[in-house]
Amino acid sequence: MNTVRVTFLLVFVLAVSLGQADKDENRMVMQEKTEQGKSYLDFAENLLLQKLEELEAKLLEEDSEESRNSRQKRCIGEGVPCDENDPRCCSGLVCLKPTLHGIWYKSYYCYKK
């Protein structure tokens, strides 16, 4: 019975000592993997940031091109309300009070001369 206890105690001590070494080794391996994972995450984050900046620059460029090409009209077209004191009707149009169908609007409209 003593030999069984001694054998069990010896196996237990060996398992604990070897297990502890494995635990320390496992901890070091985990730290290395964590550091590698962090560097990979930093790389992926930088790559994503670059792509987003490129996309933002492209969108801003398209917006500026669109605003350059689209000019606001500086005159008012036919049948559009205008101000009697400050008429901005296009050439060939005059700001007049409406006749017949538009009398109830109490506003001036651009009409052909």
Curated annotation (Swiss-Prot):
Transmembrane segments: none
Recorded superkingdom: Eukaryota
Gene Ontology cellular-component annotations: extracellular region
Leader peptide range in chain numbering: 1-21
InterPro entries tied to this protein: Toxin_22
Keywords from the UniProt entry: Disulfide bond, Ion channel impairing toxin, Knottin, Secreted, Signal, Toxin
UniProt GO MF annotations: sodium channel inhibitor activity; toxin activity
Chief subcellular location: secreted
Propeptide cleavage-removed residue intervals: 22-74
Protein localization: Secreted
Cystine pairings recorded for this chain: 75-90, 82-95, 89-110
Tissue/organ expression: Expressed by the venom gland.
Pfam family, one: Toxin_22
Family classification: Belongs to the neurotoxin 14 (magi-1) family. 01 (HNTX-16) subfamily.
Domain comment quoted from the record: The presence of a 'disulfide through disulfide knot' structurally defines this protein as a knottin.
Annotated function: Probable ion channel inhibitor.
Protein name, as recorded: U11-theraphotoxin-Hhn1a
Source lineage: Eukaryota, Metazoa, Ecdysozoa, Arthropoda, Chelicerata
